[in-house]
Regions:
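A structural signal for short loop-to-beta-strand junctions that line the ligand-binding cleft
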Residues: 63-67, 85-150
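Short loop->beta-strand "edge-of-pocket" segments that line small-molecule binding or catalytic clefts
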Residues: 169-188
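Extracytoplasmic/periplasmic substrate-binding proteins
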Residues: 231-294, 333-334, 338
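Mature extracytoplasmic/periplasmic domains
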Residues: 288-368
Length: 409
């Protein structure tokens, strides 16, 4: 008897879930995406933009992303536009691990907390949906990566190997004329310039973290005068661009981000990261959730947030000079030598790897500028900030940068 063959249908294709993350190259590294996707069991899509483009898209097109990875000072704009939703800390396993720098405003009672957009002032969602420091169940952004920035300088220009008195005033030192570079971001580079002007005694700000129109006018008057004197080399947009200015010998002193020190090549021998006596310009990144997210995607967003503070990502960030809000978590993923150098500020007992885990970025015997995490965190002068006069500052800054970089207005 002949058997009747039945045609089998093709097996159903199960489509993996996907979480869309919008941010910058500060933390959206391919290694992070790959590891998080493997650990969490769903696809993760990164969209990496520069600071202004990222902020603009986050505010105006929240439907294009699920999680926003940026800095606390951005909340002045993105939260204001209603693009984000409150994050329920009761649904985050990691919340209890977050340290006092963001929850309370400082690492301890001895800390100089700085002025400007101090993260705690924008952390908690208040009953009227505004942001403030009074603790509630809901937050606008989960604190993650942060650092305390300064400037880098060519020691050959500043007394060779003898360490000078490090001050923001060095930016406009006569021997660096024509070789000064600033980061092109009004919420960042503007404050490097302001700290320098105040350290020189040229200007005095009532609150450097929230300058008045008159103070901004004076600051830009100072900057344009320095531009006409030939003080500036250029304004840069990426850390790799900044590193290149040191590698090719163009810059003598400039705004710098920690990862850039790891790619200086031979210039590592003479470029030094400063620990200015006036204090650091600090910044703090974090994760927010777009307003449209709900259901399974909201659950993935919470899982992704918890993953960020579970340890592995914090260890990776440490290898490019950044700290993580759950400071103890990365220790299990770092060697004792790495922890001693990056967090305790001790001498490197061996060559230390970068984010790829192989190439050496810190040589044996080196010591981190500024000391331990606590020592650095206690010396904050100002935070990256979106001031009340941000629109005025941004317009004036854009004109200034265009003139420095030789572009049409």
């Amino acid at each position: 008897m002949a058997l009747k063959l039945r045609k089998l249908s093709a097996p159903a294709t199960v489509r993996r879930r996907k979480l869309r993350v919008l941010g910058t190259d500060i933390s959206l590294l391919e290694a992070v995406r790959n590891r998080a996707s493997t650990d969490l069991g769903f696809d993760i899509e990164f969209e990496v933009l520069d600071f202004p483009s990222c902020q603009r898209k986050a505010a105006l097109s929240p439907e294009t992303y699920d999680v926003y990875d940026q800095c606390f000072h951005n909340l002045s704009i993105v939260w204001y536009w209603g693009a984000l939703q409150p994050v329920d800390t009761d649904l985050l396993k990691c919340w209890d691990k977050v340290g006092p720098l963001t929850k309370l405003g400082g690492v301890d009672k001895y800390a100089n907390r700085g002025v400007g957009d101090v993260p705690v002032n924008k952390l908690y969602v208040q009953p009227d949906h505004s942001l403030g420091p009074e603790a509630t169940r809901y937050i606008a952004m989960l604190p993650t990566v942060h650092n305390f920035d300064s400037f880098g300088y060519d020691t050959r220009i500043f007394n060779g190997e003898a360490k000078p008195r490090e001050s923001w005033s060095m930016l406009f030192a006569p021997q660096a004329k024509g070789r000064l570079a600033l980061v092109d971001e009004p919420a960042i580079g503007l404050f490097d310039a302001a700290l320098a002007a105040e350290a020189m005694g040229v200007l005095k700000f009532e609150n450097i973290g929230n300058m008045t129109p008159a103070e901004l006018s004076s600051l830009f008057g100072f900057l344009h005068a320095k531009r006409q004197e030939g003080a500036f080399l250029r304004c840069w947009s990426t850390g790799h661009e900044a590193a290149g200015l040191f590698r090719n010998g163009e810059a003598a002193i400039q705004s710098m981000w920690s990862p850039a020190y790891n790619v200086l090549g031979p210039a590592t021998e003479y470029v030094r990261e400063s620990a200015p006596e006036e204090g650091y310009r600090a910044w703090h990144g974090g994760l927010s959730i777009a307003r449209h997210v709900f259901g399974a995607t909201l659950g993935m967003a919470h899982e992704y947030m918890d993953w960020w503070l579970s340890g592995w990502a914090g260890a990776l960030m440490a290898r490019q000079g950044y700290y993580i809000a759950a400071a103890a978590a990365p220790r299990a993923y770092m060697s004792s030598a790495e922890w001693a150098y990056w967090y305790d500020g001790q001498e490197a007992l061996e060559d230390l790897p970068g984010v790829d885990g192989h190439s050496t970025v810190i040589r044996k015997g080196a010591r981190r500028s500024g000391g331990s995490y606590l020592e650095r965190a206690r010396r904050i002068a100002v935070w990256n900030t979106v001031m009340d006069e941000h629109n005025y500052a941004t317009r004036a800054w854009t004109r200034f940068v265009a003139q420095v970089n030789g572009k049409a207005r």
